[in-house]
């Protein structure tokens, strides 16, 4: 997980998020990675602006400083949606297929909390008043569009979008994408299996985190 500082709302009801040069690779191990905060901030800025071109609502306003982003005020919804286009370790074991196998249709997983048993269903979210049925339909539609846009983006660059994790917030009656495009939430790998690559599911050292972060940054930097 990328470490960050959430700076309190200012008088204009904006929030600043500062990305730090450290990464939590396990519950007990944090590594320092030079310039990772700046590169993740720039990568995030690129993808937020890119999705805006496709009329996807986001709370992102602009980059503000070397490693900080400015967002409009929202109340973060207490769950996240993990979109899978390839079988991850958990699903490959359940369904008896090779890890990394591309799926015919995306799988939407809903997660609540940070524990290992975070996977829940849509009905959990509605039953426990964490989301209304109307907002759930809207969020699912937005996720489908995000996945289609980014999957196509990476395919054109000979990359496979294996997974993306989306976080949402609300302001008044509107829903906004609020994050995130960090190494922890965006998993890609090359179409060409002969290409040497860093497995985003197995980032266990500062060097691996740096290499994968730079890979995402370089893709976002290519115009």
Please provide the spans of the model-predicted regions.
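Active-site loop/lid in soluble adenylation, ligation, and acyl-transfer enzymes
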Residues: 1-112, 220
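A short glycine-rich, hydrophobically flanked beta-strand micro-motif that places a catalytic Asp/Glu
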Residues: 59-67, 154-171
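Phosphate-binding core of ATP-grasp and ATP-grasp-like enzymes
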Residues: 101-116, 147-160, 182-186
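A long amphipathic alpha-helix within ATP-dependent nucleotide-binding catalytic cores
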Residues: 130-162
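C-terminal helix-cap and adjacent tail motif
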Residues: 181-223
